[in-house]
Amino acid sequence: MIRINNLQKNFGTKKAVDIENYTIGQGDMLGLVGNNGAGKTTLFRLILDLLQADRGNVTINDIDVSKSEDWKNFTGAFIDDGFLIDYLTPEEYFYFIGKMYGLKKEEVDERLLPFERFMIGEVMGQKKFIRNYSAGNKQKIGIISAMLHHPQLLILD
């Protein structure tokens, strides 16, 4: 599903990412553990084409992420709360994300049901902007929005 080929990213003289070849198959789960500054977030940003590699490429389902955006239709991601539109309420944000994937309001409401117990009283119905939530609740909002369209691939940092 994800293929990394000769991927390299440097920041000045610091080599942040240097992966010769690596494949993550369908159904695989991978966790990255490392010190601060080890390149974990940089790798996620390269995979999601949020950062340009110095060398190499990433393909998702044989689609080069730097040449096509088709992979976004079946990929969900949440890296940090910078992904969130913080001047919206969570409800507005979920409907916005749903609309991006062609979901109607009713479909979004239905897809939010499994997450109700994590959100009732804390996130949903509060009528406040995302910027006013705790870091933990912002993470909940981001993770749920990444899963809203039932992606085949989920990338979380």
How does the language model describe each region?
Residues 2, 17-19, 72:
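Conserved structural motif at the start of ABC-family nucleotide-binding domains
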Residues 30-35:
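The feature captures the beta-strand-to-loop junction immediately N-terminal to the Walker
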Residues 48:
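Helix-to-loop junction immediately C-terminal to a conserved catalytic motif
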Residues 56-71:
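Conserved ABC transporter NBD signature motif
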Residues 129-134:
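Conserved ABC ATPase signature
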Residues 143:
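Hydrophobic anchor residue at the start of the ABC signature
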Residues 148-152:
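A short, proline-enriched helix->beta-strand linker immediately N-terminal to the Walker B motif
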